[in-house]
Amino acid sequence: LRSLRTASRALSLEHGSLLDIILRLKEIRPQMWEKTIGDLNQFTVAADPELGLSGVLKSIDVALNRYVPREWGVSPHLKVTNLTRENLRKVISAFIATGEGTHSAPFYRQGTGTINMLVLAMLSLIAEGKQNVIFAMEEPETAIPPYAQKRIVHEVRKLSAQSIFSSHSPYILEEFRAEEIGVLMRGTDGVLKQAGIELPPSVKPKRYRQEFRTRFCEALLSRRVLIAEGATEAGAIPAAARRLSELDPATYSSLEALGISTLDAGGDGQIADLGALYSSLGKSVYAVCDQQAPANQAAIEAAVTKLFMHGESDIEKLVLSNTTQAAMERFIDALSWPQHLKTAFPNPKANASEALSRYFAGKKGDLGVAEFIAQCEESEIPDWIRQMCRDLRALCQPPEPPTAS
């Protein structure tokens, strides 16, 4: 569905337009040209004296008679010119009313989504009654709400023997089984490749369907994937990269700018399987996690491009052990301190590290650590996280080769 290519004249009567094709397929020959031309030929433009134009034309007629015989020019008046079929084909188009009112506008003045749906509807008419129809649609989600995207998929699949969609929409992709999706990627050699999705044993089809939008889709659509052990890491690392890029853009970049999608693995036992899945799709895969047993560490390293593993038991301890007292006190001042923690810590600044540890434990997976990092200065963010952000930038944006002198 390309509005600039097809929809610009879909509902016109020009040769080759979708409406013209439908009329020919249905063997309808509109007998309107002669009557339309005759009606327009009898129509005089601005003939009403109240419009003021007839008086001007009368003055021209009087002035003309001063110079030439009357038979040379009589009664100037305005009419529609170029009354030919080809001219009418170009200027006639359908008007459509939208909303609950009666106001109509040319179809090409409708919104992009409306035009796309018009084109799809007309293509469906062309396809009806034909055998072995193949529908190939590029980005059908453009300017279309989610419920309509799903409707498009189901209607097109019913209508055609084979349907091919290219899409970046989770609402489109989740309508297909994993084995029906092919991931396209162009390598550095310029060759376009396709890879199928083979779910690892730890990812059951039910889980894949239930968590497709929230966990799998974004990573499928990106070139690079950062697999985080849990929700806390999945929120904290992007927040740190974004904050550092604001403070020192010459050294750091946000994960979004690097083309990295962050995926919550849901536990360290899932990292290796998910890493193998996305690596098989030709993506650069990175992982971040807490200290792991040697066997699990080796399995993860074998499945990803690079593993970032810190030495603490959890990321909350890593952050609180490597930040400043000023950063913790500033964050405490900005918090609406929970009632149950007010009782345990009447003066939280006196024991800021322990108080925030309890606070983060209650906000596990709820962006508590990410909110803390987002208010830190560069020196207040742990060295390990800063080094990880620098390493990711170096991996995704290798330095340019020196120019020859």
Spans of features found by a protein language model:
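Extended helical coiled-coil dimerization/tether regions that scaffold
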Residues: 10-13, 20-118, 122-134
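Acidic, Mg2+-coordinating catalytic modules of nucleic-acid enzymes
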Residues: 214-227, 231-405
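P-loop NTPase switch/coupling surface
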Residues: 2-14, 19-20, 404-405
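Conserved nucleotide-binding/hydrolysis micro-motifs of P-loop NTPases
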Residues: 5-8, 141, 169-171, 187-189, ...
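Switch/communication elements of ASCE P-loop NTPase nucleotide-binding domains
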Residues: 88, 94-218, 394-397, 401-404
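Flexible glycine-/small-residue-rich
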Residues: 2-5, 82, 96-98, 185, ...
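Short helix/loop capping segments that flank catalytic or ligand/cofactor-binding pockets
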Residues: 9-11, 145, 174, 235-237
